[in-house]
């Protein structure tokens, strides 16, 4: 049965209480990957995958999920500033649908508006060279996306 693809808050219901999550920032040329600890408090960078064919990309993501015994994915959804979905969001949803056919791990979609811009500002503020930024931007964006999702889930748990 294909994995569920839901907004983050709805997907969280289908994840066990503990277990790592993988955060993904889909770019046209790369996929930034981050992972949480099993308690879902901290996101750390894993790697930047140079995109090839979907099957190769998916195989690498599923291998990373297995290595970390991840129980789900958090996929950054690039919404427009007005909240609408443009071509990049549609492409991300298509990627999620294709990935869902290969795994049963639920996929949570999380608004990633301005994540890359925020990460780029932070890297510039830390004097990271343009060449180095280009190599790490997607992985850092994945960390930003996943940490935002983890913080939101933690806030919801505290409010219960």
Swiss-Prot record:
Residue ranges the record marks as coiled coil: none
InterPro entries: RNaseH-like_sf, YqgF, YqgF/RNaseH-like_dom, YqgF/RNaseH-like_dom_sf
GO molecular function, one term: nuclease activity
Keyword Cytoplasm: yes
Gene Ontology CC, one term: cytosol
Chief place of localization: cytoplasm
Compartment(s): Cytoplasm
Biological process, per Gene Ontology: rRNA 5'-end processing
Keyword Nuclease: yes
Keywords in alphabetical order: Cytoplasm, Hydrolase, Nuclease, Ribosome biogenesis
UniProt-listed Pfam families: RuvX
Domain of life of the organism encoding this protein: Bacteria
Gene3D superfamilies assigned: YqgF/RNase H-like domain (3.30.420.140)
Function: Could be a nuclease involved in processing of the 5'-end of pre-16S rRNA.
Family in the record: Belongs to the YqgF nuclease family.
Protein's name in the database: Putative pre-16S rRNA nuclease
Species of origin: Rhodopseudomonas palustris (strain TIE-1)
